[in-house]
Structure formats: structure tokens, C-alpha cells
Regions:
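Conserved alpha/beta-hydrolase "acid-adjacent" motif
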Residues: 174-180
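Gly/Ala-rich beta-loop-alpha elbow adjacent to hydrolase catalytic centers
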Residues: 74-83
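Short beta-strand/loop motif that positions the catalytic acidic residue
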Residues: 160-161, 167-169, 173
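Active-site nucleophile elbow and catalytic-triad environment of alpha/beta-hydrolase enzymes
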Residues: 137-157
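Catalytic histidine-centered segment of alpha/beta-hydrolase-like enzymes
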Residues: 50-51, 198-210
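Short, surface-exposed "cap/lid" segments of acyl-processing enzymes
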Residues: 2-43
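Active-site nucleophile loop of the alpha/beta-hydrolase fold
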Residues: 44, 97-107, 198
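Catalytic histidine neighborhood in serine/cysteine hydrolases
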Residues: 37-39, 186-201
Length: 224
């Protein structure tokens, strides 16, 4: 009898990033050498300018496949939060690897943008940002912060995830505070938090991320 195929492996990039992000590419290259295809999704849905969290979640769920398929989700920053909400809603997700996840995202965006910036965002309908994927100035509509505020009101910004989860978060991260990852992991036995001396991009910690993820996902990996 043919054994069932292993789970899909999906990578979810962060806000204003894209599927060609450094972490996504490096992880995909590493797992390709292990015989695993890590599919890097495009979460700029329906576009960066009109970015919608619900559209991001929908894109991931569509990529999971059929009813009997299973998936491992890697998520960076806002992609990490997206992965959490997909796992909360969809039993096909069997494990998460989260890199500096943007928990309490509405609160964190308010802190990053500041009250004057937030007021301008609401009044003009747009927030000026940097598109890291295309390396150019861009903007995102005010519907996004309204959507994230509503999301946080429903769940206090803390998704209810029951699957095994690995978090790698930098102690020097000034974009998504590590305190929220610590708080979220504290009361969840299935969550392992690894703290590293790094900032939000975690570029200096790629080797550590790969090592921790390999160990965490050992049940899903063939021996090298």
C-alpha cells in the first residue's frame, strides 16, 4: 500500500515584503537540498496598496490543497500572524514555524506609525510605506488598519493555536516586540520560543533558524 504523501511546506512573507525575501529564499534553498519543496506564497493580496488580511488568509487556505492534505507553515512577521490564524481555523495545518510573528499587530502598528501617522492614515485613507520587495516607496489603504483593529477586538490579537509551534524571535526586535511572543508561549506547552540576539529581519540568525527548524520538523524530514 502506497503511504500517504507528506505535508505541503508553505512560506508566508511579512508586511511589504514578498516571496523573494531573503529568509524565504534561503529556507527554500536549504529544504530543496533535503528533498522538500518549500512553496513561497505571494501574500500581497489583492495588492500591496489594497492589502487585506482576510485575502491573505484566504490565499493560504487555498494553497493548502484538498480536504485530506496537510501543511507546515513558515511565517515571518505579519506572515507569522497569518499562519496562526490559518492554523486556528483549518485543521489541515499540522505545525508552525514563526519568525518574529506580529502578534497584537494592530497595537504594534499603532506604536510604529505613531498617533500623528495613524490620524493621517485615517484622514487621507493612505499610509506611505517602503515596498521592500520592489525597493520603492509605496502606500497602503486605511482599510487594512480597520481590518486589523476588528481582528484584535475579536481575539485580543492572540490567536488560539493548538498545533506544535516553533518561534524564533530577536531580543533586539523593535518592529514586533518579543514580549508578545514570550507572553503567548508562556502558557502553551506546544509552543517553543527560541530567543536570539538579533533584530526584526533575523538575517544574522538564519543558520540558527535552519538548525532549530530542522530539529523541530525532524518527524517530517527524511534523514540527510
Amino acid at each position: 500500500m502506497t503511504p500517504p504523501p507528506g505535508p505541503k511546506w508553505l512560506y508566508l512573507h511579512g508586511f511589504a515584503s514578498g516571496p523573494e525575501s531573503t529568509k524565504g529564499v534561503k529556507l527554500a534553498e536549504h529544504y530543496a537540498r533535503r528533498g522538500v519543496h518549500l512553496e513561497r506564497l505571494d501574500l500581497r493580496q489583492p495588492s500591496l496598496e489594497r492589502l487585506s488580511f482576510e485575502a491573505m488568509v484566504r490565499t493560504v487556505r487555498e494553497a493548502l490543497g484538498g480536504e485530506r492534505d496537510r501543511a507546515i507553515l513558515f511565517g515571518s512577521s505579519m506572515g507569522g500572524l497569518t499562519a496562526c490564524h490559518v492554523a486556528q481555523e483549518d485543521a489541515r495545518v499540522c505545525a508552525l514555524v514563526l519568525l518574529a510573528p506580529a502578534l497584537r499587530i494592530a497595537h504594534q502598528m499603532r506604536r510604529t506609525v505613531g498617533e500623528p501617522g495613524l490620524r493621517q492614515w485615517r484622514e487621507t485613507g493612505w499610509l506611505d510605506i517602503q515596498d521592500y520587495a520592489e525597493k520603492r516607496p509605496a502606500r497602503v489603504h486605511a482599510g487594512l488598519i480597520a481590518e486589523l483593529d476588528a481582528l484584535e477586538a475579536r481575539s485580543a490579537g492572540v490567536p488560539d493555536v493548538r498545533v506544535p509551534t516553533l518561534i524564533v524571535h530577536g531580543r533586539q526586535d523593535t518592529t514586533t516586540e518579543i514580549a508578545y511572543s514570550r507572553e503567548w508561549a508562556r502558557d502553551r506547552r506546544q509552543v517553543r520560543l527560541v530567543e536570539v540576539e538579533d533584530g526584526h529581519e533575523l538575517t544574522a540568525s538564519l543558520g540558527r533558524i535552519i538548525g532549530e527548524a530542522d530539529d523541530f520538523l525532524k518527524p517530517f524530514l527524511a534523514s540527510p
